Amino acid sequence: VAFQSVFITGASSGLGRGLALDYARKGATVFAAARRASELEALAKELAAGAGRIVPVPLDVANLDAQEKAIRAAEAQSGGALDLVIANAGVGTPTHALDLDWRDVQRILHINTTAACATLSIALPAMVAQGRGTVVGVSSLASFRGLPGNAAYSASKAALATFLESLRIDLRGTGIQALTIYPGFVRTEMTAKNKFPMPFILDADQAVRTMVRGIARGKRSIAYPLPLVLGTRFLASLPAPVYEFVGSQIAPKRPRKKG
């Protein structure tokens, strides 16, 4: 599948940045959306001459009205509809339940779930009108069960995965694909802040290759790396009391408050 027009959120760093470069190098016009305009400009300059094009789209995905305007503008520049839209922007900081602040919970759920679902739903009408297109949501292996110390993050990514599952049913026969990506640990700015072991962690380039290959094949579920996928699927199969006991044994200790 050759995508000519691609819209990616969270494109200034990590997976989003890698995806933007990969598709642009394949000849696509990539609308790279993120808050940090300077990083987007640097991304556009990194693209070699003769490849596709990266169009910087300074955007805070939390602002849903701004998202709609940005996607509509990208559609207009693409002749009516986008070929591929990837809801990649996300946030999350491991936090023990006793230290959760409702404002942080609201922010994580709004960006990871509401804003991501908005990205995809805004792009759908034009895709349906042209009879083809692909929407992709970046969920997480953390969505398979509620991970200790990650209540808001796990919930937000599980909600996105369920949203996409519903889309797949509703969009049957329209020519539109709805794909879900379940990354494990990837070396990015976000995971660099983690203070706990991250087994089977991948470089961003490795992860991007896996994602691009899966999207090209139209795989409804793209999960990686395999050892961590098998582990999380095993945990997902456990009865609730057993999982809760196992979770309590592997849970990171609650950080001590200073002072």
Task: Locate each region found by the language model.
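Conserved glycine-rich cofactor-binding loop
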Residues: S12-S13
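Conserved glycine-rich Rossmann-like NAD(P)H-binding loop of the short-chain dehydrogenase/reductase
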Residues: A28-L43
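Substrate-binding pocket helix/loop in short-chain dehydrogenase/reductase
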Residues: H96-A97, D101-R107
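Active-site loop immediately N-terminal to the catalytic Tyr-X3-Lys motif
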Residues: L98, L147-A151
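Active-site helix of classical SDR
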Residues: L120, S156
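Residue(s) in the substrate-gating loop at a strand-loop-helix junction
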Residues: S140
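C-terminal helical subdomain
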Residues: T180, F196-G231
